[in-house]
Amino acid sequence: MSLTIAIVGRPNVGKSTLFNRLVGQKLALVDDKPGVTRDRRVHAATLQDLRFDVIDTAGLEETGDHTLEGRMRAHTKAAIDEADLILFVFDAKSGITPSDLNFASLVRKSGKPIVLVANKSESKAAIGGEYEAWSLGLGEPCSISAEHGLGLSDLRDAIMKASGGERIFASKNQEEHIALQSASLDDYIDNLEEKGDVYDKSKPLRIAVAGRPNTGKSTLINRMLGQDRLLTGPEAGLTRDSISVDWEWRGRHIKLFDTAGLRRKSKIQEKLEKLSVADTLRAIRFAEVVVIVFDATTPFEKQDLQIADLVIREGRVPLIAFNKWDLIENSQATLVDLHEKCIRLLPQVRGLRAVPLSGQYGQGIDKLMENVMMMHRVWNRRISTGKLNRWLETIVAHHPPPAVLGRRLKVKYVTQVKTRPPGFVFSCSRPKLMPQSYLRYLSNELRNTFDMPGIPIRISLRASDNPFATRSKKK
């Protein structure tokens, strides 16, 4: 069993910087502004020869339980309960504050082993803060600089001493797991795409939950998980980082990604929000299925349509969730109207799946997941070249390509070159002159004949002959 370590402390002491240093990549958003981290994030980490899971937490603040900061503190307390060991981080440059003293008392009451971490110790001004740290009653401070990577050997030794050294030396399997998690997201995506197209139920299905702010994305995920894992509330823009959580639905392992709400580009001014948006876009690209959460009381706003278009252009499986369905009075008539709008406003993908649900009460979640599983299989579908070319012969005979500059265009051959999403290459004469209307015809006929509704389909053209024609000539 692996060791779990929680990083706690007041805001802006460098917890997320230390988290990023331990996991080997910039997963948590970092900014000079206090209170950047709101949800707790768990990830596999490495420190020299030690292997463990680390939890990044929101900064502890003294405030009422029902405020945003109070709800964040409750999530940090949950992380302390989950952890086997606590890294209590303070800002050695600023010295010990009354908040540090109060929160040190809270951490001591947990009864967990604690390592006191004096961060930002690269400055001479930090010496005074390190002396003051003895007043916390947490033992000798371990001096580090998370930003510059200084003092990590001392931190490794302190963790070993506090934990007793058990459960934190990596086996070969753990090392492979860490190497995979520490790779860049782009490299991981490329690696997945190179491994082939066989549908494998044993691999976790990656689902991102996206949408504009305050549509109920985090509430929906909490209801799926059956626990208040993610911070929720009436405030718009609560989620900042893209947080991944593990879930199981009917025996299938799922990795869910909660994402920050996407606003119109013209409204995004702060650096922190720009970082959140970039994190959300990466989560969408990393996902296989993207559940786009619409507020059923105000659906199909311009931003909703732009997010759906983004998901389609990225080649992910788009699936719309009409959330807050419990607030809709005439549900049957509303659903008919919404489905008609889906067809009219999102023509890029015919047969787009849309499911009404209530994240607050859990209604419609099974229906949503049934559609997710079905569309994910379609997204992975591969069609034999023989079937494709028999289909091509039929549809070209029924509706041949148009004539351009006095000569009829010819489509001679088709093959599927990839899945996830399905991609097809058509061999034809003069591909640059093929009109978009005929490409749409090919795409729609592919959907109808091979039952591929609701997913992006990629079509490309090339000017080359049927490879079988060359063989027949040689004979």
From Swiss-Prot:
Residues the record lists as binding GTP 1: 9-16, 56-60, 119-122
Residues making up the signal peptide according to the UniProt record: none
Top-level taxon of the source organism: Bacteria
MF (Gene Ontology): GTP binding
Domain EngA-type G: start-end pairs: 3-167, 205-380
TM regions (residue ranges): none
SUPFAM superfamilies xrefs: P-loop containing nucleoside triphosphate hydrolases (SSF52540)
Keyword Glycosyltransferase: no
Binding site for GTP 2: 211-218, 258-262, 323-326
Alphabetical UniProt keywords: GTP-binding, Nucleotide-binding, Repeat, Ribosome biogenesis
GO biological process: ribosome biogenesis
Domain KH-like: 381-465
One Pfam family here: KH_dom-like
Database matches in InterPro entries: G_ENGA (IPR031166), GTP-bd (IPR006073), GTPase_Der (IPR016484), KH_dom-like (IPR032859), KH_dom-like_a/b (IPR015946), P-loop_NTPase (IPR027417), Small_GTP-bd (IPR005225)
Role noted for this protein: GTPase that plays an essential role in the late steps of ribosome biogenesis.
Complexes and interactors: Associates with the 50S ribosomal subunit.
Database matches in NCBIfam families: GTPase_EngA, small_GTP
Protein family per UniProt: Belongs to the TRAFAC class TrmE-Era-EngA-EngB-Septin-like GTPase superfamily. EngA (Der) GTPase family.
Protein name, UniProt field: GTPase Der
Taxon lineage: Bacteria, Pseudomonadati, Pseudomonadota, Alphaproteobacteria, Hyphomicrobiales
